[in-house]
């Protein structure tokens, strides 16, 4: 692909809310073009123009044929773990780079992505928002300073249809704090509380979750000390910020060889 040639982008889950946001972001970004729009087999969107629902017909027909990825340079995927892993295998077959914003992978799914990154370039991040990734840098700084005498609690809220909890963003926030403390998150996490929980154990990281309505995504990390409390928050009002970040990640991959990258690498943080 020469510099003058647009990067050919494929979108998975093309008829969904996030898929439509991604399509719009691609159509609005110079240097990229929508080449492939994928959806699940049996979807009523199959055969329709990918931009029609946006009022922006683009000449790309939604398909369920994964071999259509041969026409793309990079796939952006915000679907479900099982679907993303199927798409990953198709990307390996056709040497297509991949931006993965899907959350909820188990350890074997994450391992599969790591192995695939030895052959293709992948950006794998639970949150593509530039603001969230700036927030992670602030969290790292705060956790290194507030490493003694402060209790950490992570609160997150999302819409009623989100199926994994805590969110991938909340988990990476917890991992950021744990890493700054030189501990592993599973060793210090408190996932739920109910009944007589006893006194809070020092050095633990608590999580609390809300699911309801159409909340796009709220995250707050509390550093609770004696006589003071520091709160670092990020609130999303639109999925557009995730879509814009994902397209930015795809542009980053155009310059990369095989390897596994996160949004910190994309943003140069």
From Swiss-Prot:
Catalyzed reactions: (S)-2,3,4,5-tetrahydrodipicolinate + NAD(+) + H2O = (2S,4S)-4-hydroxy-2,3,4,5-tetrahydrodipicolinate + NADH + H(+); (S)-2,3,4,5-tetrahydrodipicolinate + NADP(+) + H2O = (2S,4S)-4-hydroxy-2,3,4,5-tetrahydrodipicolinate + NADPH + H(+)
Residues that, per the record, bind NAD(+): 13-18, 39, 101-103, 125-128
Active site (record annotation): 158 (proton donor/acceptor), 162 (proton donor)
UniProt GO MF annotations: 4-hydroxy-tetrahydrodipicolinate reductase; NAD binding; NADP binding; oxidoreductase activity, acting on CH or CH2 groups, NAD or NADP as acceptor
The protein's Enzyme Commission number: 1.17.1.8
Alphabetical keyword list: Amino-acid biosynthesis, Cytoplasm, Diaminopimelate biosynthesis, Lysine biosynthesis, NAD, NADP, Oxidoreductase
EC top class named in words: oxidoreductase
Secretion signal, residue range per the UniProt entry: none
Pathway(s) per entry: Amino-acid biosynthesis; L-lysine biosynthesis via DAP pathway; (S)-tetrahydrodipicolinate from L-aspartate: step 4/4
Disulfide bonds: none
InterPro entries linked to this entry: DapB_C, DapB_N, DapB_N_CS, DHDPR_bac, NAD(P)-bd_dom_sf
Subcellular location: Cytoplasm
Binding-site list for NADP(+): 40
UniProt entry tagged with the keyword Oxidoreductase: yes
Biological process according to GO: diaminopimelate biosynthetic process; lysine biosynthetic process via diaminopimelate
Chief subcellular location: cytoplasm
Annotated (S)-2,3,4,5-tetrahydrodipicolinate binding sites: 159, 168-169
Any Gene Ontology CC annotation: cytosol
Record-stated family: Belongs to the DapB family.
Function: Catalyzes the conversion of 4-hydroxy-tetrahydrodipicolinate (HTPA) to tetrahydrodipicolinate.
NCBIfam families registered for this protein in UniProt: dapB (TIGR00036)
Protein's name according to its UniProt entry: 4-hydroxy-tetrahydrodipicolinate reductase
